[in-house]
Amino acid sequence: MKVLLCLVCSFYIIVSSITTMTTGTPSMPAINRQTLYLAAYSSKLFSWNVGCVKTRHLSQEGDWVTRSLIYVFTFDKKPWETKADAFKVKWEPYSPLLRVQASDYVKYNLRAKPEYFIRTYDDDFLLLSDVKESRSPCSLWVTLKYVERIPETINRTFYANCPDPVTVPFDERCYP
């Protein structure tokens, strides 16, 4: 009986390691080096004078990653006025929370929160929402790979989980 149990356990370990090797764990976009673009959000998060929002990796110190938040402010002006501010993010592997340290300016003007719930992610997208509610305002961030066309599975997840969804129209001026 013990031999059979050991064989079953060994088989399970081998199969699970093969599965992990072939599928792998996706990397968390918020802490890797890729640029992320705001692709969609809940209408409650809309700011009429903010657009072309993206975030780039700047550095890492310990568990905290510093990213820049780059956006166009006030579309009425020509040329557009680009703003940038740094913020820090921390994610512990497999945690459902993304911790954020932002400047007072970003907290007040762009309504950044200290924590976000990670609804889902993979190497090329990240769906965040407020922590408190089950159907709370969301933001969908994607890499350049998905800027023009968001895959159907991601889109369905976004529309199912986020109230009053709004997609950001593709504007090539935003993606140099």
Curated annotation (Swiss-Prot):
User: Where is this gene product found?
Assistant: Secreted
Source organism superkingdom? Eukaryota
Per the UniProt entry, the signal peptide is 1-24
Q: Which UniProt keywords apply?
A: Disulfide bond, Glycoprotein, Secreted, Signal
Q: Name one GO cellular component term.
A: extracellular region
List the carbohydrate attachment sites. N155
Tissue note:
Expressed in salivary glands.
How does this polypeptide assemble, per the annotation?
Homodimer; non-disulfide-linked. Each monomer accommodates one molecule of cholesterol in a pocket.
The protein's job, in short, is: Salivary tick protein that modulates host immune response. This protein blocks dendritic cell (DC) differentiation from monocytes. In addition, it inhibits up-regulation of costimulatory molecules and pro-inflammatory cytokines in response to stimuli and promotes up-regulation of co-inhibitory molecules and the anti-inflammatory cytokine interleukin-10. It has a pocket to accomodate cholesterol, which may have immune-modulatory roles, either directly or through interactions with the host gut microbiota.
Q: What is this protein called?
A: Japanin-like-RS
